[in-house]
């Protein structure tokens, strides 16, 4: 009997979309994909998976199964379901299109890929709601991982948990995904914490078919922790109302066809995170203030993608001209960038059996 082969596909994501801080996310058409080979005969096979990693930032990815995020998350899912080891002889070929540390959900994609990998290797057939629970134990903001798993344009939140469930969900990440020591063996870390059921809830919004996303990514990384570190501990009522009003309008406006540029542009305004991140990204103030639907026909709105430094511009046409203007402003600040015009990934993550007959 031949080895079984499966493909796991996880899209990149952009979170916040202006006023939807820690709430909204969209899945986009760059991806992390895995081809997983599971041998039919395991006698004499290597006990740990072999990892082959290609694509963007592949030089920065550890290939030890006890260090690689994909396999650490997969092992967490397996052990939380009573399976203590990987199936022997597994090969994982990862191909990455998502730049690291640029605000396009690279870590969220890796977490979702790891959860799906664990589900596949354990033959668990977990429902998507349970897969999301496992992902949220690792990546504790729901916007990116929910969009990556479900696809499309989503809004999500973490529900209020009972004291018992809150205790489980608040377990430090170091206990969920421990740093395996060099001498870690098969018996190390066998009893990980169980995620509560139904940690995250979400809804899919509509998305007008005309809208594409232009992602302009500076060639430097911005750690999410650093980008969060500049945010204040509290906000004024005025600023919170500003964001809530715009978020309520934006989630409907992006579904209307044809899109209304003036409505969407104003509705993508934000006072919760972007003003505080201006100093971290040279050129950001000018980009957010000078590109408008009037100056650049086709533009609908512009925002930071996640924590940045990528700029996300939503548009219906004139994509290259919009991207070139953002690139020019970054160039004035001596910042090199790359840009891509992306479609919305409505399907989200999936696993396919690609075994040859």
Curated annotation (Swiss-Prot):
Domain of life: Eukaryota
Enzyme class: transferase
Alphabetically ordered keywords of this record: Amino-acid biosynthesis, ATP-binding, Kinase, Nucleotide-binding, Threonine biosynthesis, Transferase
Alphabetical list of Pfam families matching this protein: GHMP_kinases_C, GHMP_kinases_N
EC code(s) of this entry: 2.7.1.39
Alphabetized NCBIfam families for the sequence: thrB (TIGR00191)
Function: Commits homoserine to the threonine biosynthesis pathway by catalyzing its O-phosphorylation.
Name the record gives this protein: Homoserine kinase
Taxonomic lineage from the root: Eukaryota, Fungi, Dikarya, Basidiomycota, Agaricomycotina
Gene name of this polypeptide: THR1
């Amino acid at each position: 009997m031949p080895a079984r082969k499966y493909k796991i596909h996880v899209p990149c994501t952009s979170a916040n979309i202006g006023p939807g801080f820690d709430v909204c996310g969209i899945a986009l058409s760059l991806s992390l994909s895995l081809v997983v080979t599971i041998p039919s005969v395991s006698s004499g096979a290597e006990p740990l998976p072999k990892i082959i990693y290609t694509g963007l930032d592949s030089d920065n990815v550890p290939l030890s199964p006890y260090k690689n995020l994909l396999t650490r998350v997969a092992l967490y899912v397996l052990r939380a379901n009573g399976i203590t080891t990987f199936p022997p002889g597994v090969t994982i070929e990862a191909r990455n299109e998502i730049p690291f540390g640029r605000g396009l959900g690279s870590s969220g994609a890796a977490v979702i890929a790891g959860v799906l990998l664990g589900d596949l290797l354990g033959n668990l057939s977990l429902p998507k709601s349970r897969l999301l629970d496992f992902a949220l134990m690792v990546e504790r903001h729901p916007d990116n991982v929910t969009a990556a798993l479900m696809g499309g344009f989503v809004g999500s939140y973490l529900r209020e948990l009972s004291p018992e469930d809150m205790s489980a969900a608040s377990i430090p990440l170091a206990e969920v995904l421990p740093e395996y020591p060099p001498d870690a063996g098969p018996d190390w870390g066998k009893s990980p914490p169980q995620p509560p059921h139904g940690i995250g809830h979400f809804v899919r919004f509509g998305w007008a078919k005309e809208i594409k996303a232009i992602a302009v990514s500076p060639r430097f990384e911005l750690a999410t922790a650093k980008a969060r570190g500049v945010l204040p501990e509290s906000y004024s009522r005025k600023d919170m109302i500003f964001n809530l009003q715009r978020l309520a309008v934006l989630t409907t406006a992006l579904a209307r066809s044809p899109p209304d540029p003036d409505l969407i542009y104003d509705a993508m305004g934000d006072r919760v995170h972007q003003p505080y991140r201006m100093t971290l990204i040279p050129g950001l103030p000018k980009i957010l203030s000078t590109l408008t639907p009037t100056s650049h026909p086709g533009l609908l709105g512009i925002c930071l993608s996640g924590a940045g430094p990528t700029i996300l511009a939503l548009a219906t046409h004139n994509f290259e001209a919009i991207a070139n203007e953002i690139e020019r402003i970054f160039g004035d600040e001596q910042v090199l960038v790359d840009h891509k015009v992306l479609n919305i990934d409505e399907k989200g993550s999936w696993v396919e059996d690609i075994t040859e007959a």
